[in-house]
Amino acid sequence: MIQLTRAQKQVQKAARDFAKGEFDRETAREAEKIGQFPEEVFQRAAALGFVGIQLPEAYSGGGMGLLEAVLLAETLCALDGSLGQAVCEAGHGAECIARFGSQDQKERFLPPILEGRTAVAVAFVEAGRGISSAPAATAAPDDKGWLLNGTKHFVSNAERAGIFLTLAATPAGADETGAASMFIVDADAAGIRVTDEGRRLGGNLTGGAEVTFDEVRLTPDRLLGKPGRGLAQLEAYYMERRILLAGQALGLAQGALERAVAYVRQRVQFSRKIGAFAVTRHKIADLAARVEAARLTVYQAAAAFDAGQADARTAAIAKLTAAEAAIAAADEAIQLHGGYGYMREYDVERYYREAKALSLTAGAPGDLRDVVGASVIGKLK
């Protein structure tokens, strides 16, 4: 069992106080209706250091670890699944610049993102390609830098982004095979087209867009990291990303459980509170055990990452465990609410939608099981 430090408990308290002051049901409903998170709430979250809490203070980050980022995500998402996720996603992508960028890139791009003045949108997913596959998009080198072409899908924060991060195939050098590279692209560059991909079951506060790059000119300083290292960078990105998402999923699971408990404590059936029935207690017990098991798994993964001991398997297990716990908790919460659980008036249906959307992000359950299974079985002769 990981014993949280005083500073880590303070992160939880700060997140709880913020959410209680900023999150409410009507704000969440209105934001989801229009598909846009209130910009002023982003600003206040950034002012408290919630955007990029695990990134260096030198670039306006929080200077803490991934475990603190997980605690923040869990707390925010437990209090409101939709609004909490939107705050957590405000700085998504900044970690790539912090991990792989040059000193100049970090100084130029990170402070505006982490201070809430702009956003970065991660454009990695392509139609017909596995999430870890070499990209079909290309970046052709010339004497002025690169020419970027390709189409990306399911890009969150695209509408409010100041920059995109993307992955494109680049020619292999003398020591590179199957090379791909990561790039920083100005959102207002000529040749970029952003198209809304429509409403989704969940995750609507961060949007979802198709982004097309058509002969987009990139100067040499827009290469993120070394040429040909894009797939290795992608693997490192997914390891951190999955643990962060596991923190969000853990919050969704806890939030759904708390709402189920609150309902069974007050709902009367056959002249008794339904929380008094053994079948209800058993359902709640099973959920509580599953959520606590997920919590231990996620905290351990985050602590391992901070200690430099995490790997793809650790991250995949954390996200798989937490995401499936979130879906199970939200599903059972709906069942315990009866017909009311399906109504928009109650929050549990929204937790289910957000949990389902999150389970498909940065690796669906099948992708994660592939990672874990391959690691456990090892290479076959």
Give short role names for the model-derived ranges.
Residues A127-G130, F154-N157, G173-A174, R200-G207:
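Short Gly/Pro-enriched turn/cap motifs at secondary-structure boundaries
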